[in-house]
Amino acid sequence: MTTLRLLISDSYDPWFNLAVEECIFRQMPATQRVLFLWRNADTVVIGRAQNPWKECNTRRMEEDNVRLARRSSGGGAVFHDLGNTCFTFMAGKPEYDKTISTHIVLAALNSLGVMADASGRNDLVVKTPDGDRKVSGSAYRETKDRGFHHGTLLLNADLSRLANYLNPDKKKLAAKGITSVRSRVANLTELLPGITHEQVCQAVTEAFFAHYGERVDAEVISPDKTPDLPNFAETFARQSSWEWNFGQAPAFSHLLDERFTWGGVELHFDVEKGVITRAQVFTDSLNPAPLEALGERLQGCQYRVDVLEQACESLIAEFPAQKGELRELAAWMAQAVR
């Protein structure tokens, strides 16, 4: 009986793919070696310990319908589109060894005619006249009895969008999360014009089989077909939830300030696990009462745009004369925290 398992996702949904990865990892026998191949539509994927408000231009992501997905491994933020091929290698201990999976990916690239090297920062690079350029980045996760190595290969990614979504607005944000390190990157199409996702998947699959000396049929996974994945619905619900993607952010503080025609406003938020634990409001408005009430109302609320807007709207009944100011404040906050 083979010890290998090959899964290929037909879905471009990042929450679906990460939930599949999590289910397989939790439930695989410790003797199994797994390769999972997948790709995501427009998504910023952040590391387990990262702060999305610090790492990402969340306002632009929302405008462009780019999803946020938090993975279970560490490391930095990356932008995925259909120009990326994603891979995950899993194995039980003591056999799990990220140097083996790195070797498999390098062998796959070599079979396609690309000579790449492993760098010291979990990346694969190619040498160009302009210096080393990154074509693959990886992250890792280990538990007591198993581990996985997952990463991306840049095929034809829109590298301009990479900068758009991973360069955050200049916010006054003091945060404790892990900050992503930017790298010089290159697409494989610059080296192999016309290379496709299917060709790369085939090369990685063949290198995987060659390393272990076994072959196995691929299992194609889609939202309509999730074989042998107990508890998938619960895992997907968690992976796609605001509480996981935003609420798991490390504690941080956010200072917002603006001057309106009716006065200046300064907001100080302390946020833990996506919830406002302290809200301080300072203003030179001639009528500070609605703003003081807002500070009290926001304490304990989720740090999300719709909640902030609802808090302002709920104060209009209590302070009808300040309806215009409260709606102006709500619109500004909605832009400032995205």
From Swiss-Prot:
Cross-referenced SUPFAM superfamilies: Class II aaRS and biotin synthetases (SSF55681), SufE/NifU (SSF82649)
Keyword annotations of the record: ATP-binding, Cytoplasm, Ligase, Nucleotide-binding
Pfam families in UniProt: Lip_prot_lig_C (PF10437), LplA-B_cat (PF21948)
Reactions accelerated catalytically: L-lysyl-[lipoyl-carrier protein] + (R)-lipoate + ATP = N(6)-[(R)-lipoyl]-L-lysyl-[lipoyl-carrier protein] + AMP + diphosphate + H(+)
Record bears the keyword Ligase: yes
Main localization category: cytoplasm
Residues that coordinate or bind ATP: 71, 76-79, 134
Location(s) in or outside the cell: Cytoplasm
Enzyme class per UniProt: ligase
UniProt keyword ATP-binding present: yes
InterPro entries: aa-tRNA-synth_II/BPL/LPL, BPL_LPL_catalytic, Lipoate_ligase_A, Lipoate_protein_ligase_C, LipoylTrfase_LipoateP_Ligase
Pathway per the UniProt entry: Protein modification; protein lipoylation via exogenous pathway; protein N(6)-(lipoyl)lysine from lipoate: step 1/2; Protein modification; protein lipoylation via exogenous pathway; protein N(6)-(lipoyl)lysine from lipoate: step 2/2
GO molecular function, one term: lipoate-protein ligase activity
A GO biological process held by the record: protein modification process
Residues where (R)-lipoate binds: 134
Residue stretches making up the BPL/LPL catalytic domain: 29-216
CDD domains: LplA (cd16443)
GO cellular component term, pick one: cytosol
EC number: 6.3.1.20
HAMAP family xrefs: LplA
Family matches, as PANTHER family: LIPOATE-PROTEIN LIGASE, LIPOYLTRANSFERASE 1, MITOCHONDRIAL
Protein family according to the UniProt entry: Belongs to the LplA family.
Primary role: Catalyzes both the ATP-dependent activation of exogenously supplied lipoate to lipoyl-AMP and the transfer of the activated lipoyl onto the lipoyl domains of lipoate-dependent enzymes.
More info: In the transfer reaction, the free carboxyl group of lipoic acid is attached via an amide linkage to the epsilon-amino group of a specific lysine residue of lipoyl domains of lipoate-dependent enzymes.
Name used for this protein in its record: Lipoate-protein ligase A
Species classification: Bacteria, Pseudomonadati, Pseudomonadota, Gammaproteobacteria, Enterobacterales
